[in-house]
Amino acid sequence: MKLDILAIGAHPDDVELGCSATLTKEIANGKKIGIIDLTRGELGTRGTAETRDEESTEAANILGVSVRVNMEFADGFFVNDKVHQVELIKMIRKFKPEIVLCNAIDDRHIDHGKGSKLVSDACFLSGLIKIDTKCPDEDGWQEPWRPKHVYHYIQWKHIEPDFIVDVSGFMDKKMEAVLAYKTQFFDPNSDEPETPISSKNFTDSIEYRARDLGRLIGVKHGEGFTVERYVAVDSLYNLK
């Protein structure tokens, strides 16, 4: 299955928090979108790997993505090495995305920075013809494929974006997908331990960050991204 955009997160809910309004906007524009979760989030304080599997499936259905895959790397302990790179290369070559969205380069959770670098390196290596890979559900050797762009969404830390996507009209769907992770976010009836993301303030911050990013570009809501290399445009008139 050829995808236009592949969004990758270290944990289930990373993509929803970081860029799901952008994804739903692109789906509305007819693009084919997929999500890859690197881990099942099994080390999370609240919930279990099994409940997060269920929640991620529900969130994917809400967003309307074409496919969601979990790599089942070890939460907290996966590393950016050849073994993990090759497994991710197989997925990149399988889905052939034009654009990859992934974790923030620097963030509070160590898996976010690790995941960011792992994805960036795998995207580069995926384009090398001398790396041979086979995918279990495909016949023959895979062809090299390098995404045209890798962008990083913004997570816990305040990071100045290199560009902001106008996601006005798509925040309701984003919040619905985020709140599908019932074990992770604010629930006044939960008896599980509090975490940095389980407070009402954190849930509210999703909306007010989007409003503030939107304010910066003169729209209602925005999602910000950073880049690894300069963004090229054909004409000044392509800039909004």
Task: List PLM regions with ranges.
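Active-site rim/loop-helix segments in enzyme catalytic domains that contact anionic ligands
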Residues: 1-95, 226, 236-238
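Metal-dependent de-N-acetylase/amidase catalytic core
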Residues: 2-6, 82-240
